[in-house]
């Protein structure tokens, strides 16, 4: 880096070899008299480069993690295989079913990986292949397929379409620079996402202040390099191209270094060459500055920049947008090409427009807001060919125009007119006054642009009389030509006042909040400004949906009785109805006001299969990322869905000594199958039944001693808690403490900040959509507990006249406990805590978070019936993938057709399953992965390669009963060991040992119960005294739905083997989709539920412990 070349024989100074501008600036910061030695300076620069490289590697890892989580695992695989950079345009084509706002987050991550690949970062991600690492098996694009044997993604068609032409023809490791054969800008050859990446401020979760500058500098450097290449003569460009692909292939870093040095040399020569004199020709021309933060509306309005020189030297507008440029000259332009459109200019992002206007002129006629997006590509080319020279254009201003005011009308006359027809743009009000149409020319379309040879711009908010007074001296109205067209405009254009109001809302967004409070925003025929800027808001889930009122549902529930201590159940039809102590809460014990009431056309989260929910979570992450990166300013550059860096992976603590408080929700799921313990559900039931009329519920504090006694009762006797005669305020405070004592907030550590940002930055019109996406990303146990709590709080609000607790009052009281706002975070150092709370006053950030939490929780309480619905537009965008994720339940005829044997029936299929189970037992269940489980049970799982994300689980336990007795207990006496078993019946007996059986399992309120319809058969005459029970779901038209949601039993097998001394070994192999749960929930909790099931069967045979003293016999 440094060459020791003394300036003079006596001076020991050193020359600097050419450094990068960043390195030179860093070096020159030091004082000349006290500069570091060259060796020390090289160490500083090397350390800086190392830090930069590490930061880029972190960005690449976060981008790959996001790609896998959002349903794009194939690109993460390509990056790990060193197959980047890839063509962004091809990626966009692969995902053409996604909206533009949803593609932008993907393009940002891919541009980050392209940049990291150009730096040749050696990033090898060691991903841990855990039990729940099946995320890579889902891709939202149908252009890719997953090879399960090699566990790799492969493209359905040609893979080479993803890579740039330069990378395909040249060396695989060459720099990804493009040169063009003309003198146009390089943006002509770049796709739109690639151009947008130059202006992007986010790169996969990097820090905004430290990385955006580097990214812009690197992108500008690359642009300048290609601009130089495109403006050089052909011979010079060929010489420059030889540095890209020399005959003797050199390493990539060497070619990149030589290219950068050559670029620095050319830049210096070009800068010197411009000042050598006016006679110098053929000098190097560097492109003028490129906007690095071009606003989106600047592109939408299709503005034309007017440079100081000849217009022919600047790239046309369409070229800058990535559209193909026509080679026609101004004399060859067709009538449609000479036309243009006009509309009222948009005032959005005024500051950015002002900065852009400083760089070049802008014609008012080229501002197209409403019609620009609806016109065909030919209208975009009109702006390219409309103005070829400024000398041929004359702009007329009305005589009564006052200086300093905006002109009411403008007229542009061409000194070289052509024969074109006049026309009116019905959408924008632009009037074209040209010569009469010739006989051989066709009539122009209404939506096409008008002739530019003689054109007037008219603004919609100018009265017609005033307009004629201002333009009468400019235009020859011909009295019979224009006025009828103006009448037609007034007849055809409807709702001009609404358009003006819509523009006003766009200019002043605060006006919309007042109009929303005054009336229903859905009545407006025009979308709101936020709906215009975000495409997918146009299909809001709030449109066209009605739900039964709470009053009607409450009226229905008033006649129902609350039975305490007795379990209600309808007659099964198989045996006498049984009652026993109530340890699980039942649907019939609650009002109907808190039950979910989705409309028939609206899918609910609880009815989704695991594969469907897995797919919807990908779309939710993609949609939420698009919304938050657009509006969330504080987290715009660091958006990542990984666990925060301060949370280190530590050993999971042991919760065996805790029953209720301080236990994670997933542990409750593993114990009981429900995220909330039974004692907390009993507390909510008690408050709903007896205390909703208490004034200030959850606001008034209880007595600490009584609350402590309630906590001890819950910990010591969690299954036998009674709240009779307890104070409502004590029970309510205990419920608050339960959520406050959770190891992580109810909204999880990952997404708590996201929920707060939604209510801080996202516009009100899009908050429901953003919250729906965030709720889909919550862990299943957190989402179910949240739904139970919100439905309960909604019931509290329904009696606001008695308890005076509005949604905002409840939110203020409960938000700190649900978000853990006021708790000192463990990641904060003592110095930070001491500095933050030294004055005793919360900082502004804490105040903003508390306000956002209160507003957000109040909104969730009000919209609790809609938060857990699946948006229609998300289902529509998933296309066939959503339908393919549905589980096809076979009929009896389909079961026989699945076998290759001719004439096979469902009996043959069931016999095949029984033989397969016997074979597995004979081979000692080889290939299963064992995992830890409690209560002396053996638990293992095995992945099934049939495309469904659920695993096959196996739980084994020894039972003190012979096989035939255990089989009867499983087959006919489920009510003795399953507390959720509420209803059952035999639909049809097919033979002595085969039947179609239907039963219902209860769920936590307000979630729907699960209905099972299975075909099952059992065998008792197997070798060695074994018994089997095999069942699976079937489609049977005569069986009506008895529960809330029809679950799917893909495989359920019981194997009972004798162990001697009257004992048996019970093995249960199970694979069930309960609906409403993600694959992660099954990986974390379903295996424990299988182990708990066989444990309950074992415990049902244990003899009762006799009370009293022993007697001697």
From Swiss-Prot:
Source organism, top-level taxon: Eukaryota
Main location: cytoplasm
Annotated site location: Arginine finger: 699
Composition bias, Polar residues: 179-188, 230-245, 421-435, 529-549
Cell compartment(s), UniProt: Cytoplasm; Membrane; Mitochondrion membrane; Lipid droplet
Disulfide cysteine pairs (residue numbers): none
Alphabetical list of SUPFAM superfamilies matching this protein: Bet v1-like, GTPase activation domain, GAP, SAM/Pointed domain
Keyword Mitochondrion: yes
GO biological processes: endothelial cell migration; endothelial tube lumen extension; negative regulation of cell migration involved in sprouting angiogenesis; negative regulation of sprouting angiogenesis; signal transduction
Keyword Cytoplasm: yes
UniProt xrefs under InterPro entries: Rho_GTPase_activation_prot, RhoGAP_dom, SAM, SAM/pointed_sf, START-like_dom_sf, START_lipid-bd_dom
Modified residues (Phosphoserine): 411
Gene Ontology cellular component list: lipid droplet; mitochondrial membrane
Residue span, SAM domain: 55-122
Residue span, Rho-GAP domain: 663-868
This protein's UniProt keywords: Acetylation, Cell cycle, Cytoplasm, GTPase activation, Lipid droplet, Membrane, Mitochondrion, Phosphoprotein
Positions of region (Disordered): 164-218, 230-256, 308-343, 421-443, 514-578
Pfam families, A to Z: RhoGAP (PF00620), SAM_2 (PF07647), START (PF01852)
All residue ranges annotated as the START domain in the record: 899-1109
Sites bearing N-acetylmethionine, chain numbering: 1
Subunit structure, as described in the record: Homodimer. Interacts with TAX1BP1.
Name used for this protein in its record: StAR-related lipid transfer protein 13
Organism the protein comes from: Mus musculus (Mouse)
Gene assigned in the entry: Stard13
